[in-house]
Design a protein with these regions (language model features):
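Short, surface-exposed beta-strand/loop "edge" segments at domain boundaries and coil↔beta transitions
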Residues: 32-41, 73-78, 106-109
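Compositionally biased, intrinsically disordered low-complexity segments enriched
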Residues: 34, 57-60, 73, 93, ...
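Residue microenvironments linked to proteolytic maturation
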Residues: 10, 14, 18-28, 66-68, ...
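Short, solvent-exposed secondary-structure boundary motifs
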Residues: 1-5, 69-82
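Polar/acidic, low-complexity leader/linker segments enriched in S/T/G and N/D
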Residues: 1-62
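A generic alpha-helix propensity feature with a strong bias for hydrophobic helices
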Residues: 47, 75-78, 150
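Short conserved beta-strand and strand-loop elements enriched in small hydrophobics
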Residues: 54, 60-77, 123
Length: 153
């Protein structure tokens, strides 16, 4: 099995609330299926739906879906680098739209500062699984794929 990482560059920055109770979020496509991405990979919809369902049940719904600032080299979340918590993940066509709250951790404060200064931050997903080369020239993600985190910044 290989570490599989995908990057998506367009996320929207949202502020909810006002004053000291204001919370900063990023929202946008966190995952994509049924299209060949920039890394030359394609995730079948059935695999992505299964993994998003599992990830949502085990992590998002329990407040445990954390992500890091920076793109780690492994599939585990390093708590000292946590910057955000994924609060929603839902399917829209071939995209899975995520929403993540920027946390008040040291890395979250860096992410918040960068976003408020207009830096365009993208997200990347991480998982492990096998890849199969296709005759069309792309690699298809295998049935053994397991989503580790839906979005790191």
């Amino acid at each position: 099995m290989k570490l599989i990482r995908e990057e998506i560059e367009k996320v929207e920055v949202i502020t909810e609330g006002a004053g000291k109770s204001a919370k900063l979020y990023i929202k946008g496509p966190f995952l994509q299926a049924e299209c060949v991405n920039r890394n030359g990979r394609m995730y079948p919809m059935s695999i992505m739906e299964r993994e998003v369902k599992r990830y949502t049940e085990q992590y998002v719904n329990k407040g445990r879906a954390l992500g890091e600032l920076g793109h780690p080299d492994g599939p585990t979340v390093n708590l000292d680098r946590v910057s955000h918590k994924i609060v929603a993940l839902e399917q829209k066509g071939n995209n899975f739209i995520g929403k993540a709250q920027i946390l008040s951790t040291p890395m979250g404060k860096i992410a918040e500062s960068l976003l408020k200064e207009g830096v365009c931050l993208g997200v990347s997903s991480h998982g492990i699984g096998s890849l199969t080369s296709t005759k069309e020239g792309y690699k298809q993600v295998g049935e053994d794929f397991m989503l580790a985190t839906a979005a790191d910044i």
